[in-house]
Amino acid sequence: VYRQGDVLIVPVAAEAVPSHVAAAPKERRDARGRLVLALGEVTGHAHAVVGPGELVREPGPFGPFLLHLPQGGRVVHEEHAAITLPKGWYRVIRQREYVPGSVRIVAD
């Protein structure tokens, strides 16, 4: 398991990836060519992957995402050390916080 700030990145075995993912729409890259895993609401900084890969959002209000890195990749953020990931599949999960009456994603 990898962690960068409020983002968890969990390896997933290829055989455990749901079959619908192959045909699911892929998330677009930002203007800088990155796959954005999470955007900071306060700073505008992003947890993002540079290099080849695909990102698929799973159903639900908070994601999670499935990330495929066929050649491996790096997760970067302006305020955290970069993380190098080996090739493979990953589930990307945003940390959540409980506020009486609701659950929300942690503000980064």
Predicted feature locations:
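Short, surface-exposed, low-complexity cationic segments
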Residues: 13-42, 90-103
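Tight coil/turn sites that cap or link beta-strands
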Residues: 70-73, 78-79, 85-97, 101-102
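Short hydrophobic/aromatic patches at helix-to-coil boundaries
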Residues: 105-108
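Short acidic, Pro/Gly- and aromatic-enriched capping/linker segments at domain boundaries
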Residues: 1, 50-78
